[in-house]
Every structure is written in C-alpha cells, then in structure tokens.
Amino acid sequence: MGIRTVEEYKQSLRDGRKVYISGEKVEDVTRHRVLGLTVDTIGAGYEMAATDDKAIRDLLVASHPETGEPINRFFVTPKSAEDLRNRTRLIHSLMRTTGGLPFGKDIGTDCLNAAMAVARQMGNKQYEDNAKNFLEHLRKNDLHTCGAITCVKGDRSREPSQQKHPDYYLHVVDKNKDGIVVKGAKIHITSAPAANEILVVPTRQMRENEADYAVSFAIPANTEGITFICRNGRGPWSDKEFHPDRPVRELTEAMIVFDNVLVPWDRVFMCGEWQHSMHLAYTFATFHRFTAISYKVPSVEVMAGCAVAMAKYNGLFKVGHIREKLADIAAYVETLRALANAAANDPVMFGDIAVPNPLIANMAKLHFASKYHDFVKLIQDIGGGILATAPDKKDWDNPDIHGYLEHYLGGAKEYSTMERLQMIHETMRHVCSHESAFHEVTTVHAEGSMAAQKMMILHESPLKKYEERAKVAAGILPWGSVK
C-alpha cells in the first residue's frame, strides 16, 4: 500500500477497539465529538502525504531504501544528520500547514528507532530482526503508531518489585510457545485511541529481580485485553469563539490497560534483559526529546507572534519595557531553535543509526520546560488584562451591543476592533484558557521531567574534563597535559 488516504486510515480504526471517555464506551472513535478531533488531526498528515502539491509530498514521502517504493518519511530510519534534519523539517511543515501536530508516527518511531539501536548494541539478532520486520509492516501499511512508555508507578518512593500491586508497572506474567503475556497500564499516551499499533518500552531502569518488567514490544490497538481510558478534550469550535477558518487541532491522551495481553514472539523487542532496560529508556528519551523540541519551535513561534501582534494592537510596540520583554521572548524561541538544530547536526552513531546528540537534546528540552512559564508570563503581561475578560463572539454578533464593543474595544488606529479581538482570542488560547493550563503542565512533564533531563545532562557532560582543565589552570596538572 505504501501511502494511505485519510479515509483508509479512518476505516482502519473501526476495528472493535475498546475505548472509553467520560464513562462512555465509544463505538467509533472517528465519529466521536472529542476523539474525532484527534483522528482528524492525525488525518491531516495523511492528507498532506496524498496531496498533489509536489513540494509538500516530497517532504512527507520518501523512497523505500531497498525497493524504491513510496513510504512515509517518518519510517526512514535516521542514518545521518541530514535524516534528522529532514525529520525536523517534516514536523515543522506538518504543524505550519495543518495548524496542529499530526502525532501519528512520531512517538511510535521514536520507540522503534530506539529498540533497533539497542537490539543492535545488545547483539540480539532476533530482537533486531523483529524490529526491522515490524518497521516493514509499518511502511507497507502506512500505520499510525503511538508510544507507550510511562507506567502508572503507584508509590513513587518504591521500586517496581516493591509496589503494593505488581502491575503498577507493566510486566510479563507468563510465557508460552505463542508469545508473552503482559499485565499493567501505561498512562499519558498521546493519540492512543486513534493508533493502529502500540509500541511499548520500559519506563525506567530495572533491577535483576525485576527482569519481568524489562519488556518492549508492539501490539495492535484492537488486541483482546487492551482498553483505552481517555482524557476528555475541548471539542469543536464553539459559537462563542473568534477562531480561524480551520478545524480544531487536538490530540487526546489515554491510559492503556493491558489485562493479560498476549504478545506474539515476533513482536517482542526486549524480554527480561534488565541490564539493557535503562539503555532502551534512555535512547527512546533522546529520540523523543528531539521530536519534542522539533515540534515546540513552531508552537512557540506562534505564541511569540501573539506577543508581537498584541503589542502593536495595544499601541505599545515601541515602548521600552515592552521591547525588552519582546527581546526576552525572541531569545527564548531562538535559543530553542539553535539547540534543536545543534542536536540534529551532531548525532551519536549507534552502528548505522543516527541518534540526536543526547546532551544537546536534553539541554533543549530543559530550556523549553524550565523557562516556559516565564515565557507565558511575558505574553500575558504584553497582552493585558483583556486576555482574561474579553467578550466572546456571541457578544460581538449581538446587534444590541455590537456598537459598544466596536467603539470601546478598539486599540491602535491602524487596526480594526475585529482584528484586535481575533488576536486577543488567539492569545487567550495560548496563555489564558483551559488549553493553556493543560500545556503548562505537559510542558513540565511531557517527554520526561526536568529532573530526568538534568540527570541525562549530568551523565553526558564531560565533568572529568572540566575538572582536569581547572587543575591545569591552577597548576595542579602540567600545562598541555589535557587535550
């Protein structure tokens, strides 16, 4: 098949999967008020890949490295810095063209790329072949994948083997000739209810007595024993909103319950190799944080643009303290962009697989997460109190009060009141809404906590070299002894 149409993708989701949202069992995720938005957001990526626009199609569609047949570019295993740069360009283009993030293949391939790289380093040919064969399955059928990493964890102060319930961490409960049987739950899984395949990797390092928790595999979303319990979302645009002429773009997260799920042996990428569990989790995190910083650049560009526009609409663009805030906003965005580019340009090679530079990728994610709330505060400051108290579109459309709003809510004379209100509502969505509060939390915790990023930065940084150079400077070591 190679490249699917959006309708083929939607039809593939009508497969009997077990999905719940707000206590309701969903028979067809493609037609649900909230989950349908996730399907359409991902579907926008399929629409772009099937377009007649050659420039867009060339970005999304690549040639199979062996057969030359068309495949989605996300299914190109990165072998060079250029492959990583192409992945970033692809994510940027998808966001800027569709108005959202069609997270249909990004996280799943982060998992699979990590599984292939680690299987190779383990020297386990069976796992490596399983991963390669599964990649061919994805390429041939153009499937949407989600990555299931975070376990529910229970008491965070206790190891997996010390939990009150052993299935607070997903683990193997049985093995037979057909495969492994797993039990547990993964949580915060983006776009899970609209995925064709689920890729599972360990959430952390496991100990020798936790070998059953060191497990990685791929499984179809409609497999018996799998249940999705989804976060409710915002739903379509309402008549109260000033909104752009495009659909709402939103991705729904889910907790995935694995209740004694049978995974065939040929879909297993790790089973019991606890010594390598951290390596797999670590490698996935590097790939995924690179994906994260790639999609966050166009996201914060829009937010920065809101600040610039609001400064102009409010007549304050040339005021000194506003320009100082805009400089801080621009520095935040451009530092993130520079770090994202650097992570792609200086990869670490795992055999012939190019892994984004782990130190720089984690620095970039830490920069984004640790400074995001200050970034939001700057936009709120520039936008003004109107971000919290603005009238809605139904007020604007009411002829009894429209004149008052038109008259009193104008700003700088170069701009219409309508244009100012449109930008106010756009800015509200980013910094003063239920959606913005959601993103303030996910910025801290998605793709791993700031503590996890600091841990990886410390691990990757050449601390010994820093120390040796200081000793040379102090005369403790001879001059020229440290390269």
Where are these regions (language model features)?
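N-terminal-proximal low-complexity accessory segments that begin disordered
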Residues: 1-46
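Generic structural signal for well-ordered, non-transmembrane alpha-helical segments
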Residues: 36, 40, 136-139, 181, ...
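A structural signal for well-ordered alpha-helices, especially hydrophobic packing surfaces
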Residues: 43-46, 311, 333, 337-340, ...
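Internal helix-loop-helix
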Residues: 47-145, 197
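FAD-binding core of flavoproteins
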Residues: 147, 152-295, 458-483
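Extended amphipathic alpha-helical segments enriched in small hydrophobics
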Residues: 291-349
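Short secondary-structure subsegments characteristic of cysteine-rich extracellular domains
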Residues: 346-364
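Alpha-helix capping/hinge segments and adjacent helical runs
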Residues: 359, 363-483
